[in-house]
Structure formats: structure tokens, C-alpha cells
């Protein structure tokens, strides 16, 4: 879908760039595939803020998405493509031949009326799902499982994808968007194609209010605070903070490596931090 720009009839529409969603379904989601969604406002069960700058925003209902795609060899028809406020990608309503309804993440080039199917060995076309062991090398995939049966966890946001670049001893080698190369078990499911809404990264909200509608509150810099609130606070007039950037709790930030070693590190063949050759 294309981007929409506006005539500058107000200051906020001057910079405003949004995704044209005229081709999406305009009604409400399927009630049986939705759940209530309670806002946390960034608070935990003690009522204390654990994630700053979160709160407000438009009320949402959660759409239950099928990330597992384990309904094998039952053909489904795409009823419509819908907007989902809980994610950057669009979602597709699928009606299977046995009458069951389901939501999946909509890949690019999937339209109402298309047929999709999941199985051990199915056609390589957008929306079809199969184990990585069954796919030809070079296939573009999304919604990739890291553990068989757990459901897709990788490449689920707008425009995301990975490429199957090889196989080795029952494992599939994937190249992710970040440049990381990773091995995943060949029995893990993945869906063919790249995720819909690739223009999401070109959106410009145009005004602070549109960000607030999404549930994000104003993000204050440490240098504008008082010393009691942040290590960068205080000083006469505007200051640069006077030290290397730290979090409100004094931990180094902006580039400091914080990732701890994990048992799954052995599945990373090439780090996303290695220089691109």
C-alpha cells in the first residue's frame, strides 16, 4: 500500500505521512477471535512504574493470531485483510474449508480470495506455511519458529523477512534482516513471503498527539531534569550532562553492551555486529 501525504492546512498536517489503508476491511474484527486487553500504563503488580513513558492511548481489543500454522493440508481462503492496532503488520482473516476462522499475519502480495495452505510439502507461494526442511534454499520467509511447535517468533513485524540460505545436518541456516546468520531446526515452521506493510518505516506522525494516541507519553531527557531525578540533571543553564551517558540508575547507556551469554548462542553462526563483508 502507498503512503499518504496531506496539504499543510494545519501545522501538524505539513509533516504528516501515513500509510494509505483504503484497501483494508473497514468493519470490526471477528468477535470470537478477539480478547479484552487491559492497559498497564507501564506499571507492574505493585503499581510501580517499570516501563517509563507509557500510558493513555486508544482502547484496543486483542486479535488472536495463529502463529503456529499447524492446521496441515486444509485449504483456507483469504476473506479480507484487516488493520491490527496491536502490531505494525496487517492481518488476514482466513476461512478454512472445514469452516474454521483464523487470523494470520498478512504477507505481501496476499489479497482477498487467495488460497493458502500449511503442510509438510506445499507450493512455495506467499501465505503458505511448511517446515524449513521442505523449503528450497533461497526462499524468503517470515513468522519463523525457533522451537518446533512453539509458534513463530522471528520476522513478524511490518516488512520483515529472513532468507533460507542453506541446510546442515537437519538444521536450516537463516539470514535475518539484521545480517545475523542463525541455525534453526529443520522441523520448525515458517511462512513463505515477507510481512505486509513495508512502508511502515516511512510514517511521520506530524504531531505529538498522534504518538499519544498510540499509548506513548512524552519522553524527557535526563539533562532537563533536576539532580534528584537523573545523574545528568542540574547545572546552571543548559549543560551537556558532564559525564558519559547513563540511565536514570547510573548504568552506562548508548552503546554499552548489556547482553548476557545464553545457551542458544551456539545457534548464531554470524553475529549481526560483524562487519558486513
UniProtKB/Swiss-Prot annotation:
<dbReference type="InterPro" id="IPR022671">
    <property type="entry name" value="Ribosomal_uL2_CS"/>
</dbReference>
<keyword id="KW-0694">RNA-binding</keyword>
<comment type="similarity">
    <text>Belongs to the universal ribosomal protein uL2 family.</text>
</comment>
<dbReference type="Pfam" id="PF00181">
    <property type="entry name" value="Ribosomal_L2"/>
</dbReference>
<comment type="subunit">
    <text>Part of the 50S ribosomal subunit. Forms a bridge to the 30S subunit in the 70S ribosome.</text>
</comment>
<dbReference type="GO" id="GO:0016740">
    <property type="term" value="F:transferase activity"/>
</dbReference>
<dbReference type="InterPro" id="IPR022666">
    <property type="entry name" value="Ribosomal_uL2_RNA-bd_dom"/>
</dbReference>
<dbReference type="InterPro" id="IPR005880">
    <property type="entry name" value="Ribosomal_uL2_bac/org-type"/>
</dbReference>
<dbReference type="InterPro" id="IPR022669">
    <property type="entry name" value="Ribosomal_uL2_C"/>
</dbReference>
<dbReference type="GO" id="GO:0003735">
    <property type="term" value="F:structural constituent of ribosome"/>
</dbReference>
<keyword id="KW-0699">rRNA-binding</keyword>
<dbReference type="InterPro" id="IPR002171">
    <property type="entry name" value="Ribosomal_uL2"/>
</dbReference>
<dbReference type="GO" id="GO:0015934">
    <property type="term" value="C:large ribosomal subunit"/>
</dbReference>
<dbReference type="InterPro" id="IPR014726">
    <property type="entry name" value="Ribosomal_uL2_dom3"/>
</dbReference>
<dbReference type="Pfam" id="PF03947">
    <property type="entry name" value="Ribosomal_L2_C"/>
</dbReference>
<protein>
    <recommendedName>
        <fullName>Large ribosomal subunit protein uL2</fullName>
    </recommendedName>
</protein>
<feature type="region of interest" description="Disordered">
    <location>
        <begin position="199"/>
        <end position="277"/>
    </location>
</feature>
<comment type="function">
    <text>One of the primary rRNA binding proteins. Required for association of the 30S and 50S subunits to form the 70S ribosome, for tRNA binding and peptide bond formation. It has been suggested to have peptidyltransferase activity; this is somewhat controversial. Makes several contacts with the 16S rRNA in the 70S ribosome.</text>
</comment>
<dbReference type="GO" id="GO:0002181">
    <property type="term" value="P:cytoplasmic translation"/>
</dbReference>
<dbReference type="GO" id="GO:0019843">
    <property type="term" value="F:rRNA binding"/>
</dbReference>
<dbReference type="InterPro" id="IPR008991">
    <property type="entry name" value="Translation_prot_SH3-like_sf"/>
</dbReference>
<dbReference type="InterPro" id="IPR012340">
    <property type="entry name" value="NA-bd_OB-fold"/>
</dbReference>
<dbReference type="InterPro" id="IPR014722">
    <property type="entry name" value="Rib_uL2_dom2"/>
</dbReference>
<keyword id="KW-0687">Ribonucleoprotein</keyword>
<keyword id="KW-0689">Ribosomal protein</keyword>
Amino acid at each position: 500500500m502507498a503512503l499518504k501525504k496531506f496539504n499543510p492546512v494545519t501545522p501538524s498536517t505539513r509533516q504528516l505521512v501515513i500509510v494509505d489503508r483504503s484497501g483494508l476491511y473497514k468493519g470490526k474484527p471477528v468477535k470470537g477471535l478477539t480478547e479484552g486487553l487491559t492497559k498497564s500504563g507501564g506499571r507492574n503488580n505493585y503499581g510501580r512504574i517499570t516501563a517509563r513513558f507509557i500510558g493513555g492511548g486508544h482502547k484496543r481489543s486483542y486479535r488472536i493470531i495463529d502463529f503456529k500454522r499447524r492446521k496441515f493440508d486444509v485449504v483456507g481462503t483469504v476473506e479480507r485483510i484487516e488493520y491490527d492496532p496491536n502490531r505494525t503488520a496487517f492481518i488476514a482473516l482466513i476461512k478454512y474449508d472445514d469452516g474454521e476462522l483464523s487470523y494470520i499475519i498478512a504477507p505481501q502480495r496476499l489479497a482477498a480470495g487467495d488460497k493458502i495452505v500449511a503442510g509438510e510439502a506445499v507450493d512455495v507461494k506467499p501465505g503458505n506455511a511448511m517446515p524449513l526442511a521442505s523449503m528450497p534454499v533461497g526462499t524468503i520467509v517470515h513468522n519463523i519458529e525457533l522451537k518446533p511447535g512453539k509458534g513463530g517468533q522471528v520476522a513478524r513485524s511490518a516488512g520483515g523477512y529472513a532468507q533460507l540460505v542453506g541446510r546442515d545436518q537437519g538444521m536450516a541456516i537463516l539470514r535475518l534482516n539484521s545480517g545475523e546468520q542463525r541455525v534453526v531446526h529443520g522441523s520448525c515452521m515458517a511462512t513463505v513471503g515477507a510481512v505486509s506493510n513495508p512502508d511502515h518505516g516511512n510514517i511521520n506522525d506530524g504531531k505529538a498527539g498522534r504518538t499519544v494516541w498510540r499509548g506513548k507519553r512524552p519522553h524527557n531527557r535526563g539533562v532537563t531534569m533536576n539532580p534528584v531525578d537523573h545523574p545528568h540533571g542540574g547545572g546552571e543553564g543548559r549543560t551537556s550532562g558532564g559525564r558519559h551517558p547513563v540511565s536514570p540508575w547510573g548504568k552506562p547507556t548508548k552503546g554499552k553492551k548489556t547482553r548476557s551469554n545464553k545457551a542458544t548462542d551456539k545457534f548464531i553462526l554470524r553475529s549481526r555486529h560483524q562487519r558486513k563483508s
